[in-house]
Amino acid sequence: MSDDAELLIAGGGLNGLLLGIACAGAGLAVALVDRGNPAAMLDHGFDGRSSAIAYGSQQVLSALGLWPFIAAEAEPILEIRVADDNALLFLHYDHRELGADAPLGWIVENRVLRRALLEQARSLPTLAFLAPLEVGGVDTSPFAAEAALSDGRRLTARLVAAADGAGSPLRRAAGIRTVEWRYPQTAIVTTVRHERPHAGIAVEHFLPAGPFAILPMTGDRSSIVWTERAELAAGLIALPDAAFAAELAGRFGDFLGTVEPIGPRWTYPLQLMLAERYVDQRLALIGEAAHVIHPIAGQGLNLGIRDVAALAEIIIDARRLGLDIGDDVLLRRYQQWRRLDALLLAAVTDGLNRLFSNSIAPLRLVRDLGLAAVDRLPPLKRFLMRDAMGITGDLPRLVRGLPL
């Protein structure tokens, strides 16, 4: 049986595109299948979110030649201020405390990332982007995987990467169970323009209903991720502009002067999901097909990018040695490499959300003192900053800024 591709990727979101670019850029024959229309993916109304790109993730984008197409629309995060509601005690991260010029990360609109990835994907001769199509099912054997596409075609490959999101049909078809629950919270996402410059400072206020994050964007704008009780979010999103602006200003404060909401508003229900396994016969899960975490730390996309970096390294190294890229031993190595990172981050974000998203007075005192204590322990603080930058642990080559 001849392969139509060495690697088949189901899902053309940010992680699926990035894996395709990494592997095709190293010479692998890749087929990427997505049910969406590529033109619609670039529409301003497709996805209103911005992502926090950690330093380690920026290194991946740079190593793959993507960062020059993103940098002009990426706002550096120079400081992070974390406070429990309006408490005087807060945690303050400053990139200068690490003794380097590199920022803690960048805020980039998802549409900017998607545009750069799509353009790069289209330029690679060994990457076939098949859309709008769906992978209807995958049959695997010890020797190959065969996928049925929604247009009746069948593709064979050595390995299938499921980048098909939290509800991953391929994960379910493989019988991979999940641990999951929905939070009684919804994220309201919008963009604001403000009177004063933000100076590259990201702010996170922990309010009783959930975190309220103010993320610096280019041009005196900020992205707002407003976590609210699910039963209230629909009403807030439907408010007239003036009423919504008043509700927003009451939580935002006046430290940046007058604040004006601009552009659409979006809502996203929040959940936690962890797959019990990341692999099956000739199948590997990446990104939200493997894990979904609370956005309290802004680390969801970074977690998926580290999946991509690890899996791409294993695939390309195996191919150079003449090995089968879908071999069970290699897939188990990928699972071992990535699972603990996701488990720890899911536990931390879930714990922080539960600890801070309430108004219980004794808990509030403990967490305020905890934030202040961390702020006064430089070694711990520097470790937490480096961890948030995605540069701790067993790092794939791409995360270290090295080519595959």
Q: Where on the chain are the PLM-derived regions?
A:
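FAD/FMN-dependent oxidoreductases across multiple families
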Residues: 234-329
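Conserved Rossmann-like nucleotide-cofactor binding loop
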Residues: 15, 38, 167
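Conserved FAD-binding catalytic core of PHBH/FMO-like flavoproteins
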Residues: 61, 144-148, 153-154, 159-258, ...
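Conserved N-terminal helical subregion
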Residues: 2-4, 62, 73-173, 181-186, ...
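N-terminal FAD cofactor-binding segment of flavoenzymes
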Residues: 45-85
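Glycine-rich FAD pyrophosphate-binding loop
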Residues: 24-49
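C-terminal helical "tail/cap" subdomain of flavin- and related membrane-associated enzymes
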Residues: 313-404
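N-terminal Rossmann-like FAD-binding beta1-loop-alpha1 element of flavoenzymes
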Residues: 5-32
